[in-house]
Amino acid sequence: MARTSESSPYVEFDRKQWRTLRKSTPLVLTEEELYGLRGLGEQIDLEEVAEVYLPLSRLIHLQVAARQRLFAATATFLGEKHPDQQVPFVIGVAGSVAVGKSTTARVLQALLARWEHHPRVDLVTTDGFLYPTAELNRRGIMHRKGFPESYDRRKLLRFVTEVKSGAEEVAAPVYSHISYDIIPGQYHLIRQPDILIIEGLNVLQTGPRLMVSDLFDFSIYVDARIEDIENWYIQRFLALRKTSFSDPDAHFHHYAGLSDRDATSAAQEIWHNINRPNLVENILPTRPRATLVLRKDANHSINRLRLRKL
């Protein structure tokens, strides 16, 4: 049985307990499709999809239906003409750099789009809402890129508000990991999705004013030991020398020719000066706000889950 207590707002599961909640949900993802969704260094396989992500997709499917009934009831109370109009269900996915939240978001998008009644599932990363490099330099915070103040939070809030309000088309800026900057004039157009997934480091942040997390209907925090995340970050950094960093136009091209020793040293410096402080100061404190916490072991596999019941 799942572990819970009357004084805790959470129900805790190990993977064996969680997988029973899949019920009869079919596995509709192929190995070829999963390969295209898997991030660099990620070890997710179809077994994990079946045992972790299928029960999660079932839970969200049930919550989408319940939320639409709630919106319809409110619309009926207000005397609106179209009480059955769908309101986009918004999911936030948070976690550290290198923890695998992008893979989680992509797999979830693929599974949710196969459920009846909500085939239109869009995914947007908050990278597109970073201030452009020129603006970060103007503000003197280029060294704080990825920290909350490096994002145009008003723009992100306005974007999600417009999507959730039913706007026919809303544009999200596009970020390039090659140029390490916003791509001028390029946008990801969102057209009235059934579900919108917002993935990013700081999406569960709170504040004295309305924040984007206040608009989420469901939220996920991808968690792991800090020491494991550091190791994953370093291994990913080493692998990027032969992929993204090898592009002559890449912002980090100067790392491509480093030896393993020098690349490891560079990755450790970036981790301890930027990514670890951001995780400890800003990202990790938002974990209690998540509807569901996915806890990874050192081998990247999800083996524990914590679901908020209140």
From Swiss-Prot:
Annotated compartments: Cytoplasm
Residue positions binding ATP: G95, S96, V97, A98, V99, G100, K101, S102
Pathway, per record: Cofactor biosynthesis; coenzyme A biosynthesis; CoA from (R)-pantothenate: step 1/5
EC number: 2.7.1.33
One Pfam family, short name: PRK
Principal EC category: transferase
Keyword Endoplasmic reticulum: no
Superkingdom in the source lineage: Bacteria
Coiled-coil residue spans: none
Principal cellular location given in the protein's record: cytoplasm
Keyword tags: ATP-binding, Coenzyme A biosynthesis, Cytoplasm, Kinase, Nucleotide-binding, Transferase
GO cellular component, one term: cytoplasm
Catalyzed chemical reaction(s): (R)-pantothenate + ATP = (R)-4'-phosphopantothenate + ADP + H(+)
Classification via NCBIfam families: panK_bact
Similarity section: Belongs to the prokaryotic pantothenate kinase family.
UniProt protein name: Pantothenate kinase
Provenance organism: Rhodococcus opacus (strain B4)
